[in-house]
Amino acid sequence: MCGPLCDALLAIWKIEGVEDGSREPSNPPDLQASDLLSNLDSANLFIVPLDNDRQWYRYHRLFADLLRQRLQQSPADVTDSHLRASHWHQANGYLAEAFQHAVAAKDFERAAELAEQVWPSMEDTFQTTAWLGWIKRLPTDVIRVRPVLCTQAGWSFSDAGEPETSERHLQNAERALAGAADRAEFKPLPGNIALARAYNAQARGQVADTVKYAELAQQLIPEDDVYRRAQAVSMTTSAAATKAR
């Protein structure tokens, strides 16, 4: 914990429901939890510093257990606290923690949105295995109606060497796309789905299907997605050369 996070959790927030069902916390008053934490730290009471700057702390184990027991007496407060923590962590760039708190609050739609947001950076840094651990905590019904999340899952399972599981998610992505409104974020998906299938075919040693899906990906991937188009061209060339032998 840190001062700003404690301010966010201790503030009397109003979680406002809007017509589309989203929930956002209103701005909290300017509490001074940082001063309180500093005083407790100086007195060596209840908390332990986690960094040299003494910005982050944890509770002493026994005190944490006591607070946890007290909080469990009010389940609604537990959910509300997790939701507030999720919003705070997201606003401050801690998306992994934001996801964990959203799941703890059982706000699975919010958790799914966070998983979609963080996937590109986790894929770029070879963390798709960790990302798959995230979405395995989400209900299947939440995943399969989200074409972006399904496509990301298809790619991640392909990276993990599970082409059959990948294909199931790619099929769910196509079904979700068929019933979805036309949105800019959906435009790259058909090409990405085709490219993922090319990788799955390559993993199975299916050269003809690799060429077919890689060529389809070249047709579908937007012109400005230079990286994905280059992947499709490379796969087409490599598979065609293998086929010609």
Question: What are the residue ranges of the model-derived segments?
Answer:
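Generic structural signal for secondary-structure transition and capping sites
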Residues: 45-46, 94, 205
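Tandem amphipathic alpha-helical repeat scaffolds
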Residues: 113-121, 148-163, 189-206, 228-245
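C-terminal boundary/linker of central alpha/beta nucleotide-binding cores
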Residues: 1-70, 80-83
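Extended alpha-helical scaffolding segments used for macromolecular assembly and cargo binding
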Residues: 73-160, 165-168
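Short, polar/flexible loop-turn hinges at active-site or ligand-entry regions and domain interfaces
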Residues: 17, 71-76, 180-181
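Amphipathic alpha-helical segments of tetratricopeptide repeats
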Residues: 42, 99, 119-120, 135-140, ...
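Alpha-solenoid helical repeat architecture
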Residues: 94-96, 107-109, 145-150, 181-192, ...
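Heptad-repeat amphipathic alpha-helical coiled-coil interaction surface used
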Residues: 86, 98-99, 111, 153, ...
